[in-house]
């Protein structure tokens, strides 16, 4: 879901649209049964906080404040993606969002630019960590475990590199990760995502992180790296390598 201006239009529908980048697609095996065939992606909704005590002085909820827009200025062009804070100076996003970058530009919900100090990407999963010198305005809690089929899910990100949106849906199943089979299962949700949504946080009904958006299927479903995988990768000191400079 990295939105890019350096590639052509998305090709004909395939089983998986890798990263949801404009023109960045890969032909992969169809998702295995059973997966409901009558799921319709939900439309974008306006986030309505559950309680006024969660609002910041500027009127934005903590869930909105933790999401960031990531601009990848690479040797070959410009692309955009999303990310979210997990502590005051650490962001989670996708590996393909930050790959081949010359400069990473991070901005918050209110347009504030944050200086990036370092970035690293996971060797196996489509995950990356970005460190910022400037403090991030908010970060969410992590859920106690992975969600189950039927659980509510919201995706918070910056589709097309534009305004912050929150889309709602539910977990509709699981599948073997079509890109990284050794990592086991990933989650399938019908919450709507678009190019630029890669790296968005997927949240449960209580606003806790349950996964990371990384790809979209040709029938409009979204794939999530589950929380358990994210936690396992973050706990492995050897799982990440420093982001190499792009090649010109």
Q: Whereabouts are the PLM-identified features?
A:
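N-terminal export and membrane-targeting signals
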Residues: 1-15
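C-terminal motif of bacterial Sec signal peptides marking the signal peptidase cleavage site
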Residues: 21-24
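C-terminal cap/linker of serine protease catalytic domains
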Residues: 26-60, 209-248
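A conserved glycine-rich beta-strand in the N-terminal activation segment of trypsin-fold
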Residues: 53-57, 66-88, 94, 113-115, ...
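Conserved active-site neighborhood of the chymotrypsin/trypsin-like protease fold
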Residues: 76-80, 87-165, 241-243
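Catalytic nucleophile loop of clan PA
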Residues: 84, 192-212
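Flexible, gly/ser-rich surface segments that form the specificity/activation loops bordering the active-site cleft
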Residues: 138-184, 194-197, 214-222
């Amino acid at each position: 879901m990295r939105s890019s201006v350096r590639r052509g239009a998305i090709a004909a529908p395939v089983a998986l649209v890798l990263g949801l980048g404009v023109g960045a697609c890969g032909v992969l095996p169809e998702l295995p049964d059973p997966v409901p065939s009558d799921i319709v992606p939900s439309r974008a909704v306006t986030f309505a906080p559950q309680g006024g005590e969660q609002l910041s002085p500027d009127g934005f909820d903590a869930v909105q404040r933790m999401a960031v827009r990531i601009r990848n200025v690479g040797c070959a062009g410009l692309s955009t993606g999303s990310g979210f804070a997990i502590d005051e100076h650490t962001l989670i996003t996708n590996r393909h969002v930050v790959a081949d970058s010359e400069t990473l530009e991070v901005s918050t919900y209110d347009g504030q630019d944050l200086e990036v100090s370092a970035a690293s990407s996971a060797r196996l999963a489509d995950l990356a960590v970005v460190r910022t010198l400037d403090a991030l305005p908010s970060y969410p809690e992590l859920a106690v475990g992975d969600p189950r089929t039927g659980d509510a899910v919201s995706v918070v990100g910056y589709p097309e590199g534009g305004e912050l949106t929150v889309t709602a849906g539910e977990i509709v199943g699981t599948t073997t990760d079509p890109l990284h089979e050794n990592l086991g299962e990933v989650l399938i949700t019908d919450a709507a995502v678009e190019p630029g949504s890669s790296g968005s946080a997927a949240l449960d009904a209580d606003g806790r992180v349950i996964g990371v958006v990384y790809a979209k299927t040709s029938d409009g479903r979204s794939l999530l790296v589950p929380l358990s995988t994210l936690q396992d990768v973050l706990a492995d000191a050897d799982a990440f390598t420093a982001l190499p400079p792009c090649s010109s």
